Curated annotation (Swiss-Prot):
Localization, UniProt: Cytoplasm, Cytoskeleton
One GO cellular component term noted in the UniProt record for this chain: clathrin-coated vesicle
Organism: Schizosaccharomyces pombe (strain 972 / ATCC 24843)
Stretches assigned to coiled coil: 338-661
I/LWEQ domain ranges (all copies): 858-1100
Cited InterPro entries: ANTH_dom, ENTH, ENTH_VHS, I/LWEQ_dom_sf, ILWEQ_dom, Sla2_fam
Origin superkingdom: Eukaryota
ENTH domain segment(s): 9-139
Family: Belongs to the SLA2 family.
Keyword tags: Actin-binding, Coiled coil, Cytoplasm, Cytoskeleton, Endocytosis
Molecular function terms, GO-annotated: actin filament binding; clathrin adaptor activity; clathrin light chain binding; cytoskeletal protein-membrane anchor activity; phosphatidylinositol-3,4-bisphosphate binding; phosphatidylinositol-3,5-bisphosphate binding
GO biological process: actin cytoskeleton organization; actin filament organization; clathrin coat assembly; endocytosis; establishment or maintenance of actin cytoskeleton polarity
Protein name: Endocytosis protein end4
Region (Disordered): 265-334
Amino acid sequence: MSSFRLQSDHMQSDASLMTSVRKATSIDETAPKRKHVRSCIIFTWDHHTARPFWTAIKVQPLLANEVQTFKALITIHRVLQEGHKSALVDSQSEKGWLKTCERQYDGESSPKGYSDLIRDYVDYLLDKLSFHAQHPEFNGTFEYKEYISLRQVDDPNEGYETVYDMMNLQDHIDEFQKQLFSNFKRSNKNECRIAALVPLVQESYGIYRFLTSMLRALYSTVDAPETLEPLKHRYKSQHHRLRQFYADCSNLRYLTSLISVPRLPHDPPDLEGDDNIPDLPKRPASIAPQPTGASTIAPQPTGTSPSPPVEMNFPDTSDITPAYSEPEPIQDFWSDPTLDQQLAAQQAAQQAAQQQAELAAQQAAAQQAQLAAQQAAEMERQRMAAQQHQQALEAIQMAQAEQQRIAQEQLAQQQFQMQTQGQLAELEQQLLATRGQLEQSNVLLNQYDARVRTLENELSQAGVNLQEQIHQNDDLIESLKNQILTWKNKYEALAKLYTQLRQEHLDLLSKYKQIQLKASSAQEAIDKKEKMEREMKNKNLELADMILERDRARHELETMHRSQRDKQESTERELRLLQEKAASLERNKSSEVSNLLSRYNTEVAHLEDALHSKDRELANLGVELKSTENRYRQLLQEKEEELEIQKAAVDESLLQLSKLQLDRNDIDQAMDTQIDELLKSQLEKLDDIVDSVLATGIQRLDTSLYELDSPMHAGNQYATPEFILSTIENASNNATDFSTAFNNYFADGPNADHSEVINGVNLFSTAIYEVANNAKGLSRTTGDDQGSDRFVGLSRDLVNMAKRFLSSLFSVNTRKMDVNVKTDLVIGENIELQRYLQQLTQYSEKFLNKESENTVGLLNAPGENIEELVDNQLAETAQAIQQAILRLQNIAAKPKDDSLSPSELQVHDSLLSASIAITEAIARLIKAATASQAEIVAQGRGSSSRGAFYKKHNRWTEGLISAAKAVARATTTLIETADGVVNGTSSFEHLIVACNGVSAATAQLVAASRVKANFASKVQDHLEDAAKAVTEACKALVRQVESVALKAKEVQHEDFSSLGVHEYRRKEIEQQVQILKLENDLVAARRRLFDMRKTSYHVAEE
């Protein structure tokens, strides 16, 4: 249970880290929030690693946006500076990713001006990592624990090299801060750029303090100070530049609200005149670590669970020398009062002996000076006294050794007693643990019983669902057979009709030849021949129509056969898979349940037998005890023997109990092994399901490729550049969510949620399909063949990249990979896919008109209220619709023109009523679209504001605004055209074109809402119904206009039966010439229309 709890906590912390990284690297051009960066730093201190942080960084779509990339570099810099020391070690292997960020913006000028800053920032971070790799004794803020007390220098060459490397890094900081100041914008906020100055100020000041202390130590140690003159000159230059840098930073109010900017004196500190110069300690590998003073920039953590610093308070300029604390004396752990007294007595005896020796020596010297003659005797006496003194000292030392030995024996005895008590306590803890494990095993057994019952219920439910699906498939197969039979009958009837018409055609040809031979000079024969020719032409036309109808029916029949055959095969395949899965599941579950029940029954039987035997033994013991009590005084010896027998029986029963406990442990181990195998088989089945879902996504992408290359599929003809950009943004978000879901699936292992992966595959493949379909539709309206081929080629490359992405995630390819390798694979493929999407986005932006570019500028402007912009646009559209309705009503209320006939007045009234119906349907459509976008924003914004949601999904907002404007313009054009038709200034063809424009604008608005609509949304269904109503009203108006035009043509129909052969031939040639001219005019008009549409993408609409 503890391992599951730890795994759950680890998953929660990873999810919290992912959220903090995503919020710290948001798309907004603001500084990363302190609490999000602090969460990342605390994570490295809590887990002593930075690998999850780098994984979270690489999962985000940073390379698609320059602001996100720059904010990510700031976050990485803060983690390297204030995070755990393992962050510097783990980041050494991530230099390749940093170089990828640099290459992404190499040689390009970005719209917001971050490309140069990103390249310089990456260069500095790589330089910093190289420095820490060469000098691992430094932390992120350059506070070396062993360099605090600088008194003596062991190796001046090493100190010189360290100072030289740190000065190079200080120069790099100075170059980068100058680049930052030169890129400040006057019109926009510079919070994001100022945030990069915070770690630079902290690191530069830490390096400055260290250089000051190190140079003072070198000057106090080196014999030739002139060798340090280059370093001194460079130090002074850096001092003045650093002072200017801090002065510039003090003028930034936002920066001073975050940190305290240091203040340096005008003149650099004196490096040679300080008497209290600290010494330079030895290397960390050769001395034991000493306690260090507190750092003023980034306090070092203490204890086992350190916490990183939050506020960075810089000291004054006078506090250059770091604090120093002397090492504390080591206390004797085995100190004892009796031993202290003994040692004091020994020291007193030694001092007395020394005093006696000194006194004897003084007396000997005086006697030697006075009595030179007795020198030999005195020397002998002194030798004897020294020998006696030596013997006394040896006796004292022996007594002290004996006392020390006795004290050590007592201490060893005490340690043995304490060890024995510890072993007893440990045995008691093991006994309690064994009891707890027994209770836990009973609870686990109950859980297994409940799980078996749950699996039985699931098995029965799966069987019921399988039977229902089988019945549904049978009904579907039966309906398909009926449809096939119906189409077959239609085909046979058409074949018979075609045979009959062909026979009639042959008969007419034979009659025509006979009449042509007989009627060479008679006018009557000529008339009959012409009549026969006309009849033959009509028959030929009917025959051609029937042939076309036959070919169309044959094609539809083949298509229906093919689709029904594919559906039947897929249904049969799914049915077989379901049957096999159900059978295998039933076999596995039944065998597992039977095995578990048999084991449980056997174990219960063994335990019951043991319990009964123990009860019988206790009953026998009770009887024997009663009998022995009655015969106690008479049979004392027999009682003792019986007690011995009873003791042996109890020992045997205890042995049996221990054996039963061992057997139970073996059973539990076997059950755990079987459960692990069952889980492994279930995981393999789930992997197969994920592979099948990936295969379905690839099949959908293949369909998209076929439709993209097929001339029979025109794509979405109503697609606009704004809508294309919104679908690309949706595809980018779905790709990121899909990558995140798969990384979680790889990282969680058996505890992974497969539903997120399956949902992510479906959403990802659908989004790519929509991008390709809309891209093809937009490419057909550009009028530029080369540009159209380029656009379709980019879409084809995107679909192929998505197929490669899905193909690389099959279990066959990833089964033998490590989790980190799998995660890197998903991240790399996602980055490559985002690059393709970025290319398609850049090419699509070429088709935006000036109005759309102005909309984009308003969306990206920091001071604009996006909520009011969107609401005002929808309100203006609704107001335009209401004005159109009022205008139509005013036109209808005008007095009728007396010069028009009643039929013409009736036609005008019907056209006005149909136009009013269209505008009313459009008004309902606008209301439904307003409700739909309100629902989308309410469910998608979460805790953020509406304006933040619109800015985050700016492409979708552009498409929505553009679609609303298109509806308003199309409605206005329809009203003006209807007024022109009534007044006689416009033709019926103008009205048909206006209706088609309304239908296209309606489809664009519905598609813009459908991109972000929720699944099974009632509001979206209402919007779809309103769009259908508008389309039906437009079709009704078009049919009405066409019927009026057809009646006019019938009135103007000429009679050609009275014309002669020559006149008829001349009329026919003139008509063909007119048709050819009209066709040429039609081609030219279409070319002009293509040019106008192409130009409309670059010129503002009036």
